[in-house]
Amino acid sequence: MKLSIITINYNNLSGLRKTVESVFAQTCRDFEYIIIDGASTDGSKEYLDSIKVNNVADKANTDNKLQITNYKLQIISEPDTGIYNAMNKGIRVSHGDYLLMLNSGDYLVDSNVIARIIPELDGTDIIQGNTICTRNGKTFVNRGYGKSDINYIDVQKGYFLHQASFCKRTLFEQYGYFDESYKIAGDTVFYIRCLGKGNATFKYVNQTIAYYEGGGVSDGKNAYWIKQRALEQKRLSKEEFSIRQWNTCIEYDKKGRLYDKLHRHKWAWSIMMLMSKIINRMEK
């Protein structure tokens, strides 16, 4: 099977409906659909129970009903310990060569998204398209990196769009599953490890895949999530972007602009190396 689409949900019935209906509306059905619900109490579980045996309403269908009997569908509703625990559950039961994480509230832009993207799933480890986002009342297309030739320095910027990223399932076997000790940055850590430090390949395709609803934990603006984001950024800096790894970063970025600039100015390179040694000693 070429593709598995994984949706996680917790108490977001309205968002879940949008996501599910956008998936069931696809003209191409060469995928399995996995929904992981965290034992919701807002009616999500009952809604998921209903679509196991019934039709689901869909505005794009002329008779306002969409048959779901031909879909390979898995639904799990049970308590979990967080976003990345739920995502990992979905990954472990998936069978597709590629995985798309389309969480509740995010939805595919039209009924031909999967038909258009399937030919692009060519063996590249991670294939990323665009999302449509709305922030501060403005709607725009987010192209992430907007290029295929990314390097370690690019990876540090964290422009990954999981709603538009098709990852080979074998990457999780090779580099590990999402780190469940993170509440916000677990997917960022995964991409750093397989693209920044590992040898995974990446391709950008200029196709818009999904609407990103926003308002998730990574966008959280209350005091708790602001503090959590700061803590995880500090942890990332220490564990993934430590100055001790700077020489390795440069090695991974040999084709990047920073490497070229430093080597054109030998004094800048010498200063950078000296500062690296000093900071390494301070950190010990």
Identify the function of each model-found stretch:
Residues 1-25:
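N-proximal low-complexity "stem/linker" segments adjacent to membrane-targeting elements
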Residues 1-4, 24-35, 43, 72-74:
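Short loop->beta transition adjacent to catalytic acidic/histidine clusters or analogous donor-positioning motifs
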Residues 19, 76-94:
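Glycine-rich, basic loop-to-helix element that forms the pyrophosphate-binding segment
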Residues 107, 111-141:
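Conserved donor NDP-sugar-binding/catalytic core segment of glycosyltransferases
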Residues 189-190, 196-284:
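C-terminal subregions of glycosyltransferases and related glycan-biosynthesis enzymes
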